C-alpha cells in the first residue's frame, strides 16, 4: 500500500501540482520495519501463487524512482517517533497493514493445537521474525474460514512438498516441514452457504487441482433456492464463484465415483472435505490438546443472514487453524478504532483522527493519513488498495495545497536530516540498492536448484547481504 501510494502521489503531483500551488516535484521517504520491502506481496501471498508475486516486479519499478528513498529496517516508534517525522515531512502516511490474527473466540481456543492463520502464513512464507519450525504431526486437521486465506492454509496443508518446492521460493526449513507433514484428512468449515463464500475463482481452481488429494463436497449444500440464485447473479464475481463451485462439485462427485483418486484419476492418499453452512462452536480437547471440533449446521438466506439449526456434529481432528480475519497493527501515538479494526480516520477518507468516532469528539489531525488495511481494516485485495491510494492522495494534495497557503509545513527542510537522526541512534537503514543485493542472492540460490528464487529468511543474513 505504501509503494502504490507513493507512485500515485508522484503521478498526481505532476498532473495537478502546478494548479494546486505545490509544484510538480517531491521527495518521498518510505520506511519499512522489516529488512526488505513489499510486505503482503512477499509475506502474505501463499508460496504457490508466484504469479501474484510478480507484482513485486512492478513495485520495484516504483522504488527505482529517484524521488523515492527506501528505508528498510527502520521501526516507527522505536527508531523514529511521530514528532520527529512531523518535524521533517509535510505529511506522514501510515500503510502498516495487518499481521495479527483476530481471536477465535470459541471454547477450547487456547488448547495446544489451535493456530491462527497469520502465524502459519509467517512460517511458510519465511517471515523474518516468524517461526522456523512448525508442528505438522496431526493426521486430521480442521480449517475455519470462508475466504482466500482459509483456502491458502488448507491448500498448503494438503500440498505435496516436492511439488511445492519445484514451483515456489520456499526455503529449506519449510520444504522439510511440509515433507514431514502427516495430515491425511482436512475439513474446511465455512459458516455460510455456497453463495456467500468469499473465495476467488483462482483459489477455487487451485483447490480442485491438488495432486494426490480427493476433494469431497456435500451435494446438499448446493440445493440453492431461486432467491439465493437470483441474488448471487447480481454480482459478477459472486456469480462466477458460484458457477465455479458447481463445476467443482461435479468434479468431486466423479472423484468419489472412481474411488480414492485425485482430479487426474491418480491414487489419492489425502482427503479434503469442504463443509458449507457449518459453524464451529467448540474445539474439543483432552489433556490440554485438541482431539476434535464441534460444529453446528446453519442455514443461510438469500440476503446472507445466517441462522442456527441446533443440529451438531463432531469431527476428530488434532489441529485447528482459524482464518477468520486479520487485525491491523496499531501505531504509537495514533488512535485505533477497535470496533472496525483499523487506525482511526475520518469517515474512511484516510485522514487520521484524534479518536475513533465522532461521538467521542474525533478531530482530524493535520498531516497524518492512513491507507490500505491500516485505513479500512483487513478487507479487499490489491485493487482495493489502489483505489484507497488514489483517494488518500487526492485528499493529501488538497490538504497540502491549503497548508502551503497557510505556511503549515515541516520545519526541517533538510532532506539529509533523517539520515543524521538515524545514524546518531546507530540505525543502519537498508536502501533500494541493498534490497537488490538480497534479491540477487535469492535469485542465485534459486538458480542452483532450478528455481527462480530461494527466499532468505534470516534477518541478520539479509542485513549482511544488503550492507556488503
Residue ranges of predicted features:
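Feature captures the FAD/FMN-dependent oxidoreductase FAD-binding
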Residues: 12, 58-114, 273, 281-294
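Core beta-strand elements of the Rossmann-like FAD/NAD(P) dinucleotide-binding domain
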Residues: 84-91, 136-138, 307-318
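FAD-site-proximal beta/loop scaffold in flavoenzymes
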Residues: 113-131, 283, 289, 301-376
Amino acid at each position: 500500500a505504501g509503494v502504490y501510494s507513493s507512485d500515485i502521489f508522484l503521478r498526481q503531483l505532476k498532473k495537478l501540482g502546478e494548479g494546486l500551488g505545490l509544484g510538480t516535484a517531491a521527495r518521498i521517504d518510505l520506511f519499512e520495519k522489516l529488512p526488505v520491502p513489499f510486505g503482503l506481496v512477499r509475506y502474505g501471498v501463499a508460496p504457490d501463487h508466484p504469479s501474484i508475486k510478480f507484482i513485486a516486479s512492478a513495485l520495484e519499478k516504483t522504488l527505482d524512482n529517484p524521488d523515492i528513498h527506501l528505508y528498510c529496517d527502520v521501526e516507527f516508534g522505536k527508531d523514529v517517533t511521530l514528532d520527529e517525522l512531523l518535524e521533517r515531512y509535510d505529511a506522514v502516511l501510515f500503510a502498516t497493514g495487518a499481521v495479527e490474527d483476530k481471536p477465535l473466540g470459541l471454547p477450547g481456543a487456547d488448547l495446544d493445537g489451535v493456530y491462527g492463520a497469520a502465524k502459519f502464513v509467517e512460517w511458510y512464507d519465511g517471515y523474518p521474525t516468524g517461526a522456523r519450525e512448525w508442528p505438522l504431526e496431526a493426521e486430521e486437521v480442521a480449517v475455519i474460514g470462508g475466504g482466500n486465506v482459509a483456502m491458502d492454509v488448507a491448500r498448503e496443508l494438503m500440498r505435496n512438498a516436492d511439488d511445492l518446492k519445484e514451483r515456489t521460493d520456499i526455503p529449506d526449513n519449510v520444504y522439510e516441514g511440509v515433507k514431514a507433514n502427516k495430515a491425511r484428512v482436512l475439513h474446511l468449515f465455512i459458516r455460510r452457504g455456497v453463495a456467500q463464500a468469499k473465495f476467488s475463482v483462482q483459489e477455487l481452481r487451485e483447490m480442485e487441482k491438488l495432486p494426490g488429494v480427493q476433494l469431497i463436497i456435500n451435494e446438499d449444500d448446493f440445493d440453492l433456492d431461486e432467491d439465493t440464485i437470483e441474488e448471487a447473479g447480481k454480482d459478477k464475481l459472486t456469480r462466477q464463484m458460484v458457477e465455479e463451485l458447481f463445476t467443482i462439485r461435479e468434479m468431486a462427485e466423479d472423484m468419489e465415483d472412481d474411488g480414492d483418486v485425485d482430479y487426474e484419476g491418480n491414487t489419492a492418499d489425502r482427503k479434503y472435505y469442504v463443509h458449507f453452512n457449518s459453524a464451529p462452536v467448540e474445539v474439543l480437547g483432552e489433556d490440554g490438546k485438541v482431539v476434535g471440533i464441534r460444529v453446528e449446521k446453519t442455514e443461510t438466506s438469500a440476503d446472507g443472514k445466517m441462522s442456527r439449526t441446533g443440529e451438531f456434529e463432531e469431527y476428530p481432528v488434532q489441529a485447528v487453524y482459524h482464518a477468520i480475519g486479520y487485525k491491523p497493527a496499531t501505531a504509537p501515538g495514533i488512535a485505533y478504532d477497535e470496533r472496525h479494526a483499523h487506525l482511526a480516520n475520518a469517515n474512511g477518507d484516510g485522514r487520521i483522527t484524534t479518536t475513533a468516532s465522532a461521538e467521542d469528539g474525533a478531530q482530524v489531525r493535520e498531516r497524518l493519513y492512513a491507507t490500505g488495511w491500516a485505513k479500512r481494516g483487513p478487507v479487499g485485495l490489491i485493487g482495493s488498495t489502489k483505489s484507497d491510494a488514489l483517494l488518500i492522495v487526492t485528499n493529501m494534495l488538497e490538504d497540502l495545497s491549503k497548508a502551503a497557503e497557510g505556511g503549515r509545513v515541516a520545519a526541517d527542510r533538510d532532506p539529509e536530516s533523517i539520515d543524521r537522526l538515524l545514524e546518531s541512534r546507530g540505525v543502519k537503514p537498508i536502501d533500494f540498492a541493498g534490497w537488490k543485493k538480497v534479491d540477487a542472492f535469492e535469485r542465485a540460490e534459486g538458480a542452483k536448484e532450478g528455481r527462480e528464487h530461494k527466499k532468505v529468511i534470516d534477518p541478520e543474513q539479509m542485513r549482511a547481504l544488503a550492507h556488503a
